[in-house]
């Protein structure tokens, strides 16, 4: 992560990967510190935009980094403008994609959006919610169909006229696909312009995004200038590495920790995070200082897992999860080293639970595995497996987790 900006408050600096522009310190269009100072002098909060396309139904910890920063702005007295991309989700963000996304129906997007808001804490007290839905004036939830769905053809053509094909092909994802001969649909070029126009529609002062979103965030600033509006700052945060320690956290890769994972499952997964990722997890997912972590690598893992789980579920639930994880393998403290390992190398993924149990040798056959699961004897990291057909996407999703049969049989799965 880059060096902190001494002119900005510590809560804003924390975890920041990039801030642009970062020009003349006294210019409110070039310096976020100057914009903050001017807003305070005028007695007005900044409008901080975060756009999300509800293309799935679950939020994981990798997504939560941006929501945590948005909440920090709320707690500092600013307005969080959460844009639900119910229109743009029907196109699909081409960022990071090697092929055109499958377009979603309007109904699919609406269902996903409702699920997202629930997970963000729409029905929770602000003390436990990821975003503050309670404090008046701190949150606007906007749907970009408000301003995009009614655009007529002249308006769309005018928007297209603000960008060039050269600009779009300079975007790495488009460039790679073009150079490899992979088709790029024309509507995909429209996506960055539509997302950028969201910033015009809501008069954003700041837009949050991952480091992979810099092109789209910069497009918003360009369009604000084109339409004669005040221009936003782009504040980018790192992409969280997944449980495999190699690639970004992604449901497709099976290396995620879900926001709705129960405390024991969340703690048990986090306890296996590799040494190189621990500091980033602490910085991006908690308010704990990295310097406060134990030096011992194993104790450091456990401290991180406890802190992250507590951030989501509270300190009592996290402490119980840590205790339960220690007792999971039949002894007090950390007995995890005594659990026999079972390799996943011979397992064909995606793998259903009944097949997995027979493939790693914890059950003699698939039929026995089905019986054991239906009888309530099978657990993964202490959480009961209830469906024999529960599917696991990859070895990375299971690496380091403990598969249990009954009270005495355990296997630590290794990729």
Curated annotation (Swiss-Prot):
It comes from the Bacteria. GO terms for biological process: tyrosyl-tRNA aminoacylation. InterPro entries: aa-tRNA-synth_Ic, Rossmann-like_a/b/a_fold, S4_RNA-bd_sf, SYY-like_C, Tyr-tRNA-ligase, Tyr-tRNA-ligase_bac-type, Tyr-tRNA-ligase_bac_2. Residues 351-415 form the S4 RNA-binding domain. This is Tyrosine--tRNA ligase. ATP binds at residue 251. GO terms for cellular component: cytosol. Catalyzes the attachment of tyrosine to tRNA(Tyr) in a two-step reaction: tyrosine is first activated by ATP to form Tyr-AMP and then transferred to the acceptor end of tRNA(Tyr). A motif ('KMSKS' region) lies at residues 248-252. One of its GO terms (molecular function) is RNA binding. Keywords: Aminoacyl-tRNA synthetase, ATP-binding, Cytoplasm, Ligase, Nucleotide-binding, Protein biosynthesis, RNA-binding. It comes from Synechococcus sp. (strain CC9902). It catalyses: tRNA(Tyr) + L-tyrosine + ATP = L-tyrosyl-tRNA(Tyr) + AMP + diphosphate + H(+). It holds the Pfam family SYY_C-terminal. Coiled coil: none annotated. Its EC number is 6.1.1.1. Homodimer. A motif ('HIGH' region) lies at residues 54-63. It is found in: Cytoplasm. Belongs to the class-I aminoacyl-tRNA synthetase family. TyrS type 2 subfamily.
């Amino acid at each position: 992560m880059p060096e902190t900006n001494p002119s900005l408050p510590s809560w804003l600096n924390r975890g920041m990967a990039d801030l642009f522009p970062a020009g003349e310190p006294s210019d409110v269009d070039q310096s976020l510190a100057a914009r903050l100072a001017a807003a305070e002098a005028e007695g007005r909060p900044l409008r901080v935009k975060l756009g999300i396309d509800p293309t799935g139904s679950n939020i994981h910890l990798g997504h939560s980094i941006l929501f945590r920063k948005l909440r920090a702005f709320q707690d500092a007295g600013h307005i969080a403008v959460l844009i639900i991309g119910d229109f743009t989700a029907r196109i699909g963000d081409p960022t990071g994609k090697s092929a055109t996304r499958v377009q979603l129906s309007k109904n699919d997007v609406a269902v996903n959006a409702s699920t997202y808001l629930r997970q963000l804490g729409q029905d929770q007290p602000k003390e436990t919610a990821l975003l503050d839905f309670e404090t008046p004036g701190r949150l606007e939830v906007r749907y970009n169909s408000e301003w995009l769905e009614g655009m007529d053809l002249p308006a769309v053509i005018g928007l297209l006229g603000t960008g060039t094909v050269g600009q779009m092909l300079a975007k790495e994802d488009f460039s790679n696909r073009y150079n490899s001969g992979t088709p790029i649909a024309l509507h995909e070029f429209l996506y960055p312009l539509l997302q950028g126009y969201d910033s015009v529609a809501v008069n954003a002062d700041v837009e949050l995004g991952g480091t992979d979103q810099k092109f789209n965030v910069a497009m918003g600033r360009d369009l604000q200038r084109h339409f004669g509006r005040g221009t936003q700052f782009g504040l980018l945060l790192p992409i969280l590495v997944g449980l495999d320690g190699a690639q970004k956290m992604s449901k497709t890769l099976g290396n995620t920790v879900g926001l709705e994972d129960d405390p024991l499952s969340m703690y048990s997964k986090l306890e296996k995070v590799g040494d190189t990722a621990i500091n980033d997890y602490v910085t991006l997912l908690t308010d704990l200082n990295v310097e406060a972590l134990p030096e011992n690598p194993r104790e450091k893992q456990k401290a991180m897992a406890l802190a992250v789980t507590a951030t989501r579920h509270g300190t009592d639930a996290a402490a119980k999860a840590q205790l339960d994880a220690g007792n999971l393998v039949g002894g007090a403290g950390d007995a995890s080293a005594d659990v026999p390992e079972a390799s996943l190398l011979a397992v064909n993924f995606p793998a259903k639970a009944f097949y997995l149990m027979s493939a790693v040798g914890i059950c003699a056959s698939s039929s026995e595995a089905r019986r054991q699961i239906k009888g309530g004897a099978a657990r993964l990291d202490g959480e009961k497996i209830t469906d024999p057909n529960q599917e696991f996407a990859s070895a990375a999703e299971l690496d380091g987790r403990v598969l249990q049969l009954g009270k005495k049989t355990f296997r630590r799965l290794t990729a």
